[in-house]
Amino acid sequence: MYAVIKTGGKQYKVAVGEKLKVEQIPADIDAEITLDQVLAVGEGESIKFGTPLVSGASVKATVVSHGRHAKVTIFKMRRRKHYQKHGGHRQNYTELRIDAINA
């Protein structure tokens, strides 16, 4: 069984037992959270799509860890003008383990 969930402005296809990194969620480590924005649920050949959400469906997950992604380097330069600007960004994430899918 799998589900398509929406969190942090992104959509993820998840199954029970998977781990995934999503945008940071303010929750403690080892806390159980419920993701109720389920867009689709499927098992085998049968798929149930929501309009836009599947009513009564939810995904239970456990927070495994919090962290930061690898650094993205930003470099701006104007040719022939001796202008260079360096910058960087590291996005925070929350790692989740999917425990159950309720459809």
UniProtKB/Swiss-Prot annotation:
Example GO BP: translation
Keyword list, A-Z: Ribonucleoprotein, Ribosomal protein, RNA-binding, rRNA-binding
InterPro entries assigned to the protein according to its UniProt record, in alphabetical order: bL21-like, bL21-like_sf, Ribosomal_bL21, Ribosomal_bL21_CS
GO molecular function: rRNA binding; structural constituent of ribosome
Pfam families found in the cross-reference section: Ribosomal_L21p
Entry-linked PROSITE patterns: RIBOSOMAL_L21
Highest taxon of source: Bacteria
GO CC term (a single one): ribosome
Function: This protein binds to 23S rRNA in the presence of protein L20.
Family to which this protein belongs: Belongs to the bacterial ribosomal protein bL21 family.
UniProt subunit comment: Part of the 50S ribosomal subunit. Contacts protein L20.
Stated name of the protein: Large ribosomal subunit protein bL21
The species this protein was found in: Burkholderia multivorans (strain ATCC 17616 / 249)
